[in-house]
Amino acid sequence: MAIQFVTKESLSRIDESTGQVSRDGTKTALLLLPYDIGFIAGYNDLYVAEKVAVKTYGAMVMCRTGTFVGIVGYLDSPPLGNTIIDIEKSGPGIAGTSIFSTKPQFTQTNNLTAGVLSTTTFASGNQIRFKVTTLGNVSQPGSGMRVILKCKV
């Protein structure tokens, strides 16, 4: 088994296009690393799938500056009609606004149709909220939703 030694200095994030050098002058850190964020909806307290509802299911504060790359999702039970989700970004001086110009949706299938990103950047301190915004059919909106917001930092 390989063991890698990691130090604080070797994790310094350097953009070489600026002419900066690493602390020890030899190592540079990787940039644009994956920073995927998972959200769930439509589960009870025992993680048994249940119908999704129109509400906010998760919120977090971003701790790094980065970019939104895309979104993927899956429902254990597909909806009848279109169940639409949204991710809103807010922060100092920014009201909660969607990061999508076309919101992602489950269109009578288990897999999420990705939507179109209109906001692609976030900063440390920005808040994001994951919501189910529209149910195509209240009696069969889908259940057991898992969504991953793909980001890079």
Task: Give the predicted meaning of each segment.
Residues F130-V138:
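Short beta-strand-plus-loop segments that form exposed binding edges in beta-rich domains
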Residues M1-G19, K152-V153:
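Short, intrinsically disordered N-terminal pre-domain segments
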Residues G73-N126:
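Terminal beta-strand-rich extracellular "head" domains
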